[in-house]
């Protein structure tokens, strides 16, 4: 029984990042559950991060990418993989509505072709280090 529970822990997906700042209404939607996006909360692949009219959330991914979602924003973390030794990896996120400020991390420096962000109307590849995405009211 002890072996089985440790096996389950090993199968749990590693966090892609951590909530570093949070204010107002901000939550993480994970597998149908709505969790508060409190400072220190894990952010995982397939999570949806949402903020209300008074909300904002700052996330640091494991490769040191910084994501800052403004009020009335919806962000889906579609893909994230990062090798801490080679700094190779992949990052894809969708900004469904609102704004997202990004300061790219190690993946974008090592493999910029593997970093992309989508909005309801456009797909963006990363070639710089800092940018802001404004998806407006977006489409859910």
Set out the residue ranges of the language-model regions:
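Flexible, surface-exposed loop/linker segments and immediately adjacent secondary-structure boundaries
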Residues: 7-140
